[in-house]
Amino acid sequence: FFELDGKHVLLTSPQDMLPEGLEYHTGNGTLCIIGEMDKDTYTLKEQFNQSVDYGIDFYAMQTVEAPDGRRIMIGWMQNWDTLAHRCNDSKWFAQMSLPRELSVKNGRLYQTPIKELDALRKNRVEYNDVVIENDTITLDRVEGRTIDMELVIRPEDKENVYKKFALRFAQNEKFHTELSFRPYESVLKIDRKFSGTERALVHQRRCLVNGDANELKLRVILDRFSAEVFINHG
């Protein structure tokens, strides 16, 4: 619980949740309540609520206030339902998320990678005005298992919007993970069913995207064992 940008914010990680549209999913989840604190009764008057993270594995987030006043959050990229699937010969299991800077805008909790990560960027590759026409393309030098990538996707003709955009990563001849967006539905989906797991785990998760459906902005940070996606600046 903390104060941020003129609002009071409560973060919690409920268990055994019931689904509610695309905002909340079954099982272990995350919840952010934004409102005003009544200092006389010590109660939080709720104004908005949302999931903290819309991915498949994110739980038990914690925050700290940095010396410069930033509110920084980190989360556990795992959940209680999959703890039994640890391989006996593995030296470690699960991991923590990247640190994220939090802010509150228009009743929503925004999250962006901390600015310190920018110092780790190198070997810059940039493409502009790439046109995709009913086909799959690969871009030279956009490769590897550790990437910090920013994309802006928009239709050439706003009156004739594309049906689906998909980005595949961690891909070889047999495996891949896919991130896709359908502008007519404003829905972004992560699909890891072809990532190589042999377990009957949750493989897909969808979320609604706020903002202009004619322009989608993504920042995808790909690690060897994870992918974190930030939509429309957080």
Regions found by a protein language model. Give the residues of each.
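Beta-rich accessory regions
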Residues: 3, 31, 36-57, 62-234
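Hydrophobic core segments of beta-strands in well-ordered, beta-rich domains
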Residues: 7-20, 71-77, 81
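Structural motif
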Residues: 18-34
